[in-house]
Amino acid sequence: MKPLERAMKTLTLIMGLFLLAMIAQSSYAQQSPQPPTETIKTAASHTPEQQEVINLSNIKWDWMADKKVDSLETLFDDEAMFTHMGGTWGKTQELATIKSGGIWYKKAAVYAVDARIFGNTALLLEDIDLQAAVGEHEVTNPFMVTEVYIKENGKWMLTQLTFSHLLRPVKMNSNKN
């Protein structure tokens, strides 16, 4: 076999192996599962304590939409932390942001809620679409909201509120108010 023929066969073999590897990789990529679009379901029934926290959370969304910072001030623990897409801050800054309209929580559409009670701690997960005005821009985003409440002296206090952006599309019909 001449050197040129040997080089051509080697090159053909390498190209064939490369093509086979590309096909295998493409096939694997097409079989990869898509990320989940919904991770929680609302239970058919809740304990009275779970329902109390769910109701409190719903009232909180109304207070935020109506900018009722006096009501929110009594709900938020003094050491509470709020995690948004743009950063994390405490109670004072959250209330100031709501009062000034820096973030106006116009409407929260809650699609699913999971409430769990651990002693005097309540963990709430909510699958929501949030319509908000951020500065001069109105936006609607899908979030998984995590809320943590602590019961002190018979009263639930919000200690943590975190917005985690979801990959699913927005479900809310947005008719700008």
Question: Can you say where each PLM-predicted feature lies in the sequence?
Answer:
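Bacterial N-terminal signal peptides that target proteins for export
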Residues: 2-15
